[in-house]
Structures are given as structure tokens and as C-alpha cells.
């Protein structure tokens, strides 16, 4: 099914310019949205809790900062860009008591609305504007006069103005320059979670670790295994990112291409596909979200345990040693502190 696309000429910037926008959070997306909204002539304020390390940064960049409650009371469009696991409590404690008839509540990801962790009053417009790129790229493209494609969705539209408002917001952060895709909260949430879990984060991570283990257990040096299954992954992903799988296969050697065709289906087979379907079913049913919420309610104990086990994998020890040799690699804070 073809998606519905919108561009700059389909969006009226004056709509969002006539509103007061509160952006809750000042992380990767928060700073990109806020600065680009401001540069597009929108009256914007940032909502951050007292003591947040981001307050000084936002103020240094010329933005007005208040608590989430203060800016929610002031605004008539509230964009929630805090972490997923913090949004429900922020909504209950700071946003909901300050909602007024005609307000719009926007999100950068649909999880809390789709799985009803947040239930907005019926008089509030509920929508989503979600650039398909990290915040630094969204901001850089905006400054360069370009844009990152964005998604919009409307979940609740009591005034019949939701789509026009979302398109106006998307235009203000540069999304309509590249193209805006209309979707739903359900589609965005479930596809995003599946991609993260089955392929981008969970699937790729386990594939890399297992490949490393197979090579080391067969007697190869950990350093050689690291280079072959992790370090060179970026080269392949960059080719796929630039021109799809066909571009990657065109660019690698015939030996690599032929071997990939033969061995890839032996690694990712029909059984893998069935397990992926089971992951998708857990997402669709809300089982994953229930487990996510339970983890937060239990003080992140499950997540911390998983993090610890992952950090202790031998590939991490080998990787840190090899990255010390790579002057061109940006080192993470955890390795440079």
C-alpha cells in the first residue's frame, strides 16, 4: 500500500507560528526541535525538571526554560520528547493538570499513546511528528536548508485541525523539505520496536557476538574475530545505507557476494523468521511494553542485569583494546573518562 506524502507546499508554517510550543526534554531530538522551531519563528519554551543538567545548555542557546508544569500551563502545543519510560509520570504530574480546551499534545514516538500508558482528555488533539534521523542530523540538515524525512500521525482530533498542525510543525523543523509520511500511532510504534529488537539492536548484536564466539572457539585470535565480525560491519552498513542491498553486493568482492548468497540463508533461515514473528506478536500484544513498565517499576533491575552481562562479554574487552589503535574513531565517554 502506497504511503501518503506531503512536502513544503502542503504545509502552512503560519499555523505553528501562531501557537505557543512547549518542548518537554532537551536531548537529541529535543534540542533539534527547539532550535529549529525558534529559527522558524515559533514561540518555544523548554520543559526540564529542576536540577537538570540540560537547563544551562538550553539557556546558553537562548531558549527560555521552565519546569514541565510551567511550560505546559503556558503552551497550547506540547511536544513530549522525554524518554519513553518517563513520559507517563511527566504527563500525570506536570502536563495533564495544565491541559486546556484546544491544546495539542504531540509526541516523537507513539509507544505511550498506542499502549495507553497515557490517556489524553477528549478535548486535546493528540498527534505525532517523528523525524527519521537522530537529532544532530535533523538540526544540521535544517541549518543547511535541507531536511530529514518525518512521520506524522493523528490519534485524536476534536477540532479537525490535527493534520494541518502536525504538517506545520514538521515544516518548522525541516521535515517537509525532504518529505513527510502519514502513518498511525500503531504502525509507527510497532514497526519501530520490531526494527530495534529483531534487527537493529537485538538481532545485530547477537549475530555479531555469536560470530565472534564461533571464531574464538575455533582457535582464531580475538582481535582477528573482532575485525571481521564487528569492525567491518560499518563498511557494509554504510553501503546498504547509501544504496540498498544491491549497492552493497555490487561494491564487495565477487567472493564476498557469492559466499553471502550461499551462507546467509544458513544463518537466517525459516526458523529465524518464525522467531521474528513471535517477537512481533509480543510487541503487538503489549507484552513487551508490560515488561518494560515492570522493569521501571522495579527500579530497572532487569535492565541493569542485562547491561552488566553484556558489558562483560569478551568482545567488549577486545574491542576497547583495538579502538585504542584507531585515532579516527570517536571514543565514547565510557572509554575516555
UniProtKB/Swiss-Prot annotation:
**Pfam families, sorted:** KARI_C, KARI_N
A Gene Ontology MF term for this entry? magnesium ion binding
Reactions catalysed, semicolon-separated, are: (2R)-2,3-dihydroxy-3-methylbutanoate + NADP(+) = (2S)-2-acetolactate + NADPH + H(+); (2R,3R)-2,3-dihydroxy-3-methylpentanoate + NADP(+) = (S)-2-ethyl-2-hydroxy-3-oxobutanoate + NADPH + H(+)
Q: A GO term (biological process) for this protein?
A: isoleucine biosynthetic process
Annotated pathway:
Amino-acid biosynthesis; L-isoleucine biosynthesis; L-isoleucine from 2-oxobutanoate: step 2/4; Amino-acid biosynthesis; L-valine biosynthesis; L-valine from pyruvate: step 2/4
Q: Which residues bind Mg(2+) 1?
A: 192, 196
What Enzyme Commission number(s) appear in the record?
1.1.1.86
Task: List positions binding NADP(+).
Answer: 26-29, 49, 52, 54, 84-87, 135
Give all cystine bridges in this chain. Answer: none
Query: Residues in domain KARI N-terminal Rossmann?
Result: 3-183
Q: Which UniProt keywords apply?
A: Amino-acid biosynthesis, Branched-chain amino acid biosynthesis, Magnesium, Metal-binding, NADP, Oxidoreductase
Q: Give start and end of each KARI C-terminal knotted domain.
A: 184-329
Coiled-coil ranges from the UniProt annotation: none
List, separated by semicolons, the cofactors it needs.
Mg(2+)
InterPro entries per the UniProt record, alphabetical:
6-PGluconate_DH-like_C_sf (IPR008927), KARI (IPR013023), KARI_C (IPR000506), KARI_N (IPR013116), KARI_prok (IPR014359), NAD(P)-bd_dom_sf (IPR036291)
User: What is the cofactor note?
Assistant: Binds 2 magnesium ions per subunit.
Give the first-level EC class, as a single word: oxidoreductase
Q: Where is Mg(2+) 2 bound in this sequence?
A: 192, 228, 232
GO terms under cellular component: cytosol
Describe the function of this protein. Involved in the biosynthesis of branched-chain amino acids (BCAA). Catalyzes an alkyl-migration followed by a ketol-acid reduction of (S)-2-acetolactate (S2AL) to yield (R)-2,3-dihydroxy-isovalerate. In the isomerase reaction, S2AL is rearranged via a Mg-dependent methyl migration to produce 3-hydroxy-3-methyl-2-ketobutyrate (HMKB). In the reductase reaction, this 2-ketoacid undergoes a metal-dependent reduction by NADPH to yield (R)-2,3-dihydroxy-isovalerate.
Assigned protein family: Belongs to the ketol-acid reductoisomerase family.
Q: What is this protein's name?
A: Ketol-acid reductoisomerase (NADP(+))
Say which species the protein is native to: Rhodococcus opacus (strain B4)
- List the taxonomic lineage: Bacteria, Bacillati, Actinomycetota, Actinomycetes, Mycobacteriales
